[in-house]
């Protein structure tokens, strides 16, 4: 079976936005118009095709990014729907990593909201070309131009409208296409599914001319040949303008802006036309680079079926019918179902059982998958998110995906003995699906501790345990992931000697411990001269310190951001062993940390509250009482936006408190920002509580 769709006609796109800007609705409409769904799923009826986990349908938010294939004309469009809630940024990161382009959906009333900024920064990091779709143009307070201004000011992007709205709010009835200079009017009877072209309305003619000039000036700056024609007063053809907009978009010089109302079926076809016209195919983006697993040198893989196979796994999902599904993006070559691949990240051989093309929650079995495509495989045992798949004879490791450290933890315990076994297995499954979720056992209490990116994140995980895995569990109160660090430089000795009958033990070291700047982590330096500690025992000292630093001296939290130099020591010909030096290392660390002015660190969250003017004072007073620092305030669409830095420990239950203080009219978002030293009085309380 040969390739059905050529590479230049393939688009891999993501749809990204703030919660409730209308992301899933937009995706639903795309699936409807491309003929994949016969009945449109409404998010607020809980029937959207893309939101297929029960929790998503209940909460009306998208949690897992479902990958779906659809056709528009002769183009294949693979869409990855990404969640907008900040607890799930990890999902957004991993989908952006494997996309070629994205559609950023903004609400015409709210404009650029805090989460939009986070997602936009992630897309900048992976250099993903974008189109902006200003949605909900039929809502009261809709303002297309304010939206464009906010994209410029808040996201520091270069938005260029290629459409203008005709009317707004309840009079929104069409758009002016600035590339072809014509009006597109929605047909009310067919729910906007049909539209007709018309002359540009007289009252908009002048404005349309002005914006078209702006569009041409903007794209001509990136294209010398166009600039010459334009300055010479020649008319540019539609094709020339389209080609120039495409080039500038792919080079991330501009971000074309279009508008519509997905819920009212308006403008979705134009959005699809723009995706095909302006977003890159796998051939338009640079060849992916990786490391040759044999030689360690950098190599590239071009988007071509003739190159060796290479793919990146970007999502693991448990499907009730086929078991574990692994979603992957093929960068080069061809993969057949039933064949063997090599997981170069884990250095394991894997067999591809079946290959599936996913459509939100239906699946179609395929025989092979080609360069530039996205598919799911069944039967992979070892592969997890961020792993590379390739042939064993030409192994490559593609750049992996980095995952943030979790900041909030809760203890979870099974209700019955029968639940105990299920709990362990279920948690491992969930952790393999979501790398920002961690599971560990507390050595002192024997409790199972799960940690994640926020309260909602953990709430949904506990919910899935009960529903999907049928595990009954009790959940403790959320705990903050504190850290410890040191503030002074010290030099100490660690000596472990045991000489009573039989073979003795002897390990002796001197270490220097000093603080490093925040975020630097742990560093070990071997500064031994003249072999006073033999080379083979040095890694054991390092290991001893690493084990000891997991439980800090103040309150048992992991110690971070310090440097240890092994400077001196001694050994015994017969009695020294790795074990003895490991114990000496850990003894030295414990003593050094206690003398080096240990302090507690706590996660500080960046909080943004959108609040009506009249509740502003209460909200600020409340944030101050939570040890918050107000960073700034600005007006936005009839409300005030307060940004603050607040310790996570003070933010538990904030959603409920904020709701009652503002009669449910304020909303907030919270993301982890950095770790900071805990004030002395608070620190003493925490230590006293731990030592009890």
From Swiss-Prot:
Q: Name one GO molecular function term.
A: GTPase activity
Among InterPro entries, the record links this protein to:
EFG_II, EFG_III, EFG_III/V, EFG_IV, EFG_V, EFG_V-like, EFTu-like_2, G_TR_CS
Of the GO CC terms on this record, one is:
cytoplasm
Q: Where is the tr-type G domain?
A: 8-283
Instruction: Identify the domain of life.
Output: Bacteria
Q: A Pfam family this protein belongs to?
A: GTP_EFTU_D2
Binding sites annotated in the UniProt record for GTP: 17-24, 81-85, 135-138
> Principal localization?
cytoplasm
Localization recorded for this chain is: Cytoplasm
- Entry keyword set: Cytoplasm, Elongation factor, GTP-binding, Nucleotide-binding, Protein biosynthesis
Q: Which SMART domains match?
A: EFG_C, EFG_IV
Family as reported in the entry's similarity comment: Belongs to the TRAFAC class translation factor GTPase superfamily. Classic translation factor GTPase family. EF-G/EF-2 subfamily.
> What's this chain's function?
Catalyzes the GTP-dependent ribosomal translocation step during translation elongation. During this step, the ribosome changes from the pre-translocational (PRE) to the post-translocational (POST) state as the newly formed A-site-bound peptidyl-tRNA and P-site-bound deacylated tRNA move to the P and E sites, respectively. Catalyzes the coordinated movement of the two tRNA molecules, the mRNA and conformational changes in the ribosome.
Identification of the protein by name: Elongation factor G 2
Q: Which organism is it from?
A: Geobacter sulfurreducens (strain ATCC 51573 / DSM 12127 / PCA)
């Amino acid at each position: 079976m040969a390739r059905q769709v050529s590479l230049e006609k393939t688009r891999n796109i993501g749809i990204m936005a703030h919660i409730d800007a209308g992301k899933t609705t937009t995706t639903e409409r795309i699936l409807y118009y491309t003929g994949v769904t016969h009945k449109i799923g409404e998010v607020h009826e809980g029937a959207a095709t893309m939101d297929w986990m029960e929790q998503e349908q209940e909460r009306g938010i998208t949690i897992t990014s479902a990958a779906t294939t659809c056709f528009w004309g002769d183009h294949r469009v693979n869409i990855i729907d990404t969640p907008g809630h900040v607890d799930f940024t990890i999902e957004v990161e991993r989908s952006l990593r494997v996309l070629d382009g994205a559609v950023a959906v903004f609400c015409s009333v709210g404009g650029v909201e805090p989460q939009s900024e986070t997602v936009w920064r992630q897309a900048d990091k992976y250099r993903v070309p974008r189109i902006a779709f200003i949605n909900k143009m039929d809502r009261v307070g809709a303002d297309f131009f304010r939206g464009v201004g906010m994209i410029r000011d808040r996201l520091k992007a270069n938005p260029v409208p290629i459409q203008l709205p005709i009317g707004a709010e309840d009079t929104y009835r069409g758009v002016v296409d600035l590339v072809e200079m014509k009006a597109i009017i929605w047909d009310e009877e067919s729910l906007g599914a049909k539209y007709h072209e018309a002359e540009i309305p007289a009252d908009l003619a002048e404005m349309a001319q002005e914006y078209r000039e702006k569009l041409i000036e903007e794209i001509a700056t990136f294209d010398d040949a166009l600039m010459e024609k334009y300055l010479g007063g020649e008319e540019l053809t539609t094709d020339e303008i389209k080609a120039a907009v495409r080039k500038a978009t792919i080079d991330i010089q501009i971000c074309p802006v279009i508008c519509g109302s997905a819920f009212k079926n308006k403008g979705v076809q134009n959005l699809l036309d723009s995706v095909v016209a302006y977003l890159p195919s796998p051939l338009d983006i640079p060849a992916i680079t990786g490391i040759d697993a044999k030689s360690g040198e950098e190599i590239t893989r071009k988007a071509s079926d003739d190159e060796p196979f290479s793919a990146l796994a970007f999502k693991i999902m448990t499907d009730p019918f086929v078991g574990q599904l692994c979603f992957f993006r093929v960068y080069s070559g061809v993969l057949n179902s039933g064949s063997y691949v090599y997981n170069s990240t884990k250095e394991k051989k894997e067999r591809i059982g079946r290959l599936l093309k996913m459509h939100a929650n239906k699946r179609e079995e395929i025989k092979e998958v080609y360069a530039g495509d996205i598919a799911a495989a069944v039967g992979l045992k070892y592969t997890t998110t961020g792993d590379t798949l390739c042939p064993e004879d030409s192994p490559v490791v593609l750049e992996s995906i980095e995952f943030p450290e979790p900041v909030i933890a809760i203890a979870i315990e099974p209700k019955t003995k029968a639940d105990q076994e299920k709990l362990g297995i279920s948690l491992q499954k969930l952790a393999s699906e979501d790398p920002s979720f961690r599971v560990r056992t507390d050595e002192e209490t024997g409790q199972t501790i799960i940690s994640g990116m926020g309260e909602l994140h953990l709430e949904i995980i506990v919910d899935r345990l009960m529903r999907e895995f049928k595990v009954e569990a009790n959940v403790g109160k959320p705990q903050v992931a504190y850290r410890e660090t040191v503030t002074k430089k010290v030099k100490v000795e660690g000596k472990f000697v045991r000489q009573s009958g039989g073979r003795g033990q002897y390990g002796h070291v001197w270490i220097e411990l000093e603080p490093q700047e925040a975020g630097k982590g742990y560093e070990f330096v071997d500064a031994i001269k003249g072999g006073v500690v033999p080379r083979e025992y040095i890694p054991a000292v390092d290991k001893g310190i690493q084990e000891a630093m997991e439980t800090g001296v103040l309150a048992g939290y992991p110690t971070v951001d310090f440097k240890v130099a092994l400077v001196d020591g001694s050994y015994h010909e017969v009695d020294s062993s790795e074990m003895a030096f490991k114990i000496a290392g850990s003894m030295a660390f414990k003593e050094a940390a206690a003398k080096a002015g240990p302090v507690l660190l706590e996660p500080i969250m960046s909080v943004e509250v959108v609040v009506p003017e009249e509740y502003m004072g209460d909200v600020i007073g409340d944030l101050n009482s939570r040890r918050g620092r107000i960073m700034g305030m600005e007006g936005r669409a009839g409300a005030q936006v307060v940004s603050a830095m607040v310790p996570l420990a003070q933010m538990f239950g904030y959603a409920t408190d904020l709701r009652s203080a503002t009669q449910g009219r304020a909303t907030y978002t919270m993301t982890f920002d950095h770790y900071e030293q805990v004030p002395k009085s608070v620190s003493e309380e925490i230590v006293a509580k731990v030592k009890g």
